[in-house]
Amino acid sequence: MELLDVIKRPVITEKSMLAMDEKKYTFEVDTRANKTLVKQAVESAFDVKVANVNILNVRPKFKRMGKYAGYTKKRRKAIVTLTEDSKEIQLFEAAE
């Protein structure tokens, strides 16, 4: 698996935005990725030092649309904590 394929997208929620003040960034990652791969991918993509990686699996939810029923996709989230001397990740860059 390539390092660029590990990180899918940042998770943008109120809780994840508040965690950014403590240098904790939440990403949706590939379901096959482990902590070591996530750490290498974040360090190479954003040029930062990673202190800790926590991973959690999000189970699929049952959804119904009229008579059709199914499940959402299972996901995997990674909460990446940066070191104190590391620079911040700019997820939202202002276009000038």
UniProtKB/Swiss-Prot annotation:
GO terms for cellular component: ribonucleoprotein complex; ribosome. It comes from the Bacteria. InterPro entries: Nucleotide-bd_a/b_plait_sf (IPR012677), Ribosomal_uL23-like (IPR013025), Ribosomal_uL23/eL15/eS24_sf (IPR012678), Ribosomal_uL23_CS (IPR001014). The keyword RNA-binding applies. Keywords: Ribonucleoprotein, Ribosomal protein, RNA-binding, rRNA-binding. The keyword Plastid does not apply. GO terms for biological process: translation. GO terms for molecular function: rRNA binding; structural constituent of ribosome. Part of the 50S ribosomal subunit. Contacts protein L29, and trigger factor when it is bound to the ribosome. This is Large ribosomal subunit protein uL23. The gene is rplW.
